[in-house]
Structure formats: structure tokens, C-alpha cells
Amino acid sequence: MNKILFYFFFFLTLILSATVYLFGGPMMLFFINYKTDLLKVDDVYNHEIYSNQSAAIPKIIHQTWKTNEIPEKWVGAQKSCIDLHPDYEYVLWTDESMREFIATDYPWFLTQYDSYPYNIERADVVRYFILYKYGGIYLDLDVGCNRTLDPLLHYPAWVRRTSPSGISNNVMGFAKGHPFLLQVVRNLPRFAFNYHFPYLTVMYSTGPLFLSIIWSAWRKLPDAEAWHHIWVMVPELYEKSHHAFFEIYEGSSWHDSDAGFVFYMLHHWAIFTFLGFLTFFIVVYFIFGYALKPAARVSRTGRRVFSSPFSKTSPSRWKIFHRFTSSNEKYDQTRSDSLPFMSDYDLESQTQSHSP
């Protein structure tokens, strides 16, 4: 009995530990107070704090794709950003130029770069290195521009808030050599792990969840200078608003089938949390309320005696928990059968021996 309980709690501890390891960081994102981090509409058009300074972010727009030939569905998005920013440098990084960039400027990371199982992971990590070295604004190819991005250049570091919590890496602006990005690239090897589910692997190793966890730790550090602050763009500045800087086109489809289930869980997190706790309590109740419930035995005087499930004389409800009684604890079959309250107690189903 004690051994069974030990294994039960041992595996329960393993499951809980794995859950905390996988979801502890993301769950903490729900408790972040964004008030001091939000980049609001009024802030963008009233940047007196930077009025006497030049733009912190250089006028460079970075995008990535496999080759120089991007899909037709994103040509409009790309053209909108180029046309609105004739004085910006535009760079489209390809798979070939991205790997060459890592090999030349960050050779210590090349082995890790090549080892990622999914190409989207390489596209994720290279944007962090590019923005750290050159600065500028990174946009996914499915992000078009509604207006000039000049007002955003006065904020040394900005990202956008994502749902249900955390930040995204599909739209980012950083000054060259920003220390937050240095912290990001230094942590990439530590988070490089294959979870065997494409969506979880990408999100945790290089994607938005990874970036959100690093940002959550970063914002707890002493903010000595405003230059180190990471601004989080409110949804009104991102899309679907007359203040929005961007327009979202049809996105890429790197998500696998597991992503659909994860998205469903995120949208119904309260239900799944309730079901998780309910399952846990049902298992605990079944173990302690039924399988380990003290069972009745018959004493020599014919009385029903309830003993502890840990007792060697306790006939358990499960055969796996059964304890054989010693030879000196034999029951009187004749007397037991004559007792009315024993009519529903099948002694023959127990593995105890009886005297004739």
C-alpha cells in the first residue's frame, strides 16, 4: 500500500513539475501590470521627452523571406511600406543572406542556428540579431503600412502587445545595440529545446512566448534610463483603428495542427482550467475515498470491524491493494452466515480461509 501511494505521488509530482516548467513562465504573463509599459495614441503624437533629440531608431525596414521572390499575397503589404517611406532603407533578408550574416558576424551562434528543426525558428532568431546590429524596424511580410512610421522612431524600443498576454515579435522597433536584444540573443541557446510539437517548439524556443518571458524578466531590472525601457504598443496603434500604423494581410501558415488545439485552449482557458482541477480532485477522491476506504472485516464475536487501509488485516476493495490475513485470524463461516447484517458481505470473494 505504501509503495503504491509513493508511486502515485511521485508521478503526480513529476506531472506538476513538468506543467510548471512548461507553463509557469507564460502563466506569470497574465499577472503583469502593463500600465507603465503601454505606448498609447497620445504618447506617440506627444513625444516631448524626445523633442530635443534625434530619432533613436534608424530609418531601416527589415523583412525576411526564403528568396527575393515573395508570394503574391504579400506584395501589396510590402509595397505599401516601401511607398510610404521613400527615405527609409529597405532590406529583404533571404535564407542565404541570413545564414551568411550569422556566419560572418556571430559565428559562435552558427551551430545553434543550423540545428533548429524549423525554418521559422531561424527567421525568428535572425531578426533579433539584425535589429541588435543595425537597429531599425522589423515587419513580418503580412504586415502592411497605413501611415508613416516616423513618430515611432523616437522610442528606442517598442513591440506590440499580443493576446491573451505577452508581446509579439512580428512588429518591432529597436535602436542599434539595444541592451534588451543582447539579453535576448544570449538566452537563445538556453531555450533551444524541441518539444516535438511544432507550435510549442517555435513559440517557446524563439517565438513570442520566448520573447515575452525574457521581457518579463527584463522589466524587473532597475530602469536606470528611459532608453532601456521597452514600450508595448496598444492594439489601437497596431491595427483596425484610424490611428493604426499597420494593416494585416493574409498571414503565413507555418502553424501545424497542434496550433489549432493550443489556440482553442487559450480562447477557452477557464474551461480547461476547471476541467484540470476537476480531474485532479476526482482522481484524489477515487484513491482516498474508494480504493483506500477502510473495509469491513468480521471479528471472532461476529461484529463488523472497520480497520485502516494500511492495516495488514484490512481487506481492500482492489485486489492490487489486498492484504492476506495471518493464520490466527480465521473467521467462523457458520456464525458469519447466520448474522443478518452480513448478508451483503461476500466472504468468498475475499482470499481469506475459513474454518469448517
Curated annotation (Swiss-Prot):
Listed GO MF terms: mannosyltransferase activity
Glycosylation site list: 52, 146
Cellular compartments annotated: Endoplasmic reticulum membrane; Golgi apparatus, cis-Golgi network membrane; Golgi apparatus, trans-Golgi network membrane
Superkingdom, natural source: Eukaryota
Membrane topology listed for this record: Multi-pass membrane protein
Disulfide bridge map: none
Family listed: Belongs to the glycosyltransferase 32 family.
CC per GO annotation: cis-Golgi network membrane; endoplasmic reticulum; endoplasmic reticulum membrane; Golgi apparatus; trans-Golgi network; trans-Golgi network membrane
Record-linked PANTHER family: MANNOSYL PHOSPHORYLINOSITOL CERAMIDE SYNTHASE, MANNOSYL PHOSPHORYLINOSITOL CERAMIDE SYNTHASE CSH1-RELATED
Signal peptide segment: none
Key word Transmembrane present: yes
BP terms from Gene Ontology: mannosyl-inositol phosphorylceramide biosynthetic process
Full protein name: Inositol phosphoceramide mannosyltransferase 3
Modification Phosphoserine occurs at: 307, 353, 355
Pfam family, one: Gly_transf_sug
InterPro entries registered for this protein in UniProt: Glycosyltransferase_domain, GlycoTrfase_DXD_sugar-bd_CS, Nucleotide-diphossugar_trans
SUPFAM superfamilies recorded: Nucleotide-diphospho-sugar transferases
E.C. no: 2.4.-.-
Principal location listed in the UniProt entry: endoplasmic reticulum
Functional note: With imt1 and imt2, is required for the synthesis of mannosylinositol phosphoceramide (MIPC). Catalyzes the addition of mannosyl to inositol phosphoceramide (IPC). MIPC is essential for cell morphology, cell-surface distribution of ergosterol, localization for plasma-membrane transporters, and lipid-raft-mediated endocytosis of plasma membrane proteins to the vacuole.
Transmembrane segments: 4-24, 197-217, 269-289
UniProt KW keywords: Endoplasmic reticulum, Glycoprotein, Glycosyltransferase, Golgi apparatus, Membrane, Phosphoprotein, Transferase, Transmembrane, Transmembrane helix
